[in-house]
Amino acid sequence: MTVSDPTAFCASHAQAVAELLGETRQAQFDGLASATATMFGCPIGAISVVECDRQWFKAVTDPSICEMPVEQSICRHAFDGTDLLVVEDLTKDARFSANPLVTDGGMRFYAGRPIWVRIGPDSDLVPIGALCMVDFVPRSFSAQERQTLEQLGLAAQSLVQAAIDAALAERSAERLTELLAEQQRSHRQLRQGEKIAGFGTWRLCLADNRVEWSDQVYAIHEVPKGQEEMLEDALSFYPPSDLSLIHISEPTRLLSISY
């Protein structure tokens, strides 16, 4: 998968990533960044997040590094379709030789594995950053090291995806709680309205011919709340003069149900 314009592409989901992941440092991300740096003997290991206007770090072994303008981001170039982005000498690569991180910051070596995730159940895979490492001297990177970085990158990708999924699940749970509270408020208002107006509501369960009453119907008929009634028994509460009206309207009501 490739992204022809990483900056423009990231603009479409940058806010969602920041909101879901959060910028607070977490031990599991810090641990993976530190393990990556240690394993390869690099001074800096990081998990970056590339947004439309900046790059920040979910984890980085150098606490003095917080964020940078997206124009200086090396990680965003990892979205060009290659599995890994490895630059053994940044001064010899035209894409990076004039980058302030190289000319002023002294960076010479970069290796990163892009992180692709789904931001929602219907989302396509999108790149959000990279598991990367930096050194201040040029260095070679063997095939075995590439394989190891790929495996670590998959671990980082799974970790980030799990964090996003957890945040989405929490949002869904909060929304369900809100909907339940709204439903309960509506039911309370309906019960209050029934009580004030002196009427009740009921419905027929077609599966077993059982009638479900609102609280006010129980009060009107002066029977214990919660007592279940079959349709035949429920109809016995009506005056004989009204039964013909009920029997006439009932088939019409049932046939008008939309499925």
Where in this protein do the model-derived segments appear?
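PAS/Per-ARNT-Sim sensory domains
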Residues: 87, 92-98, 106, 226-249
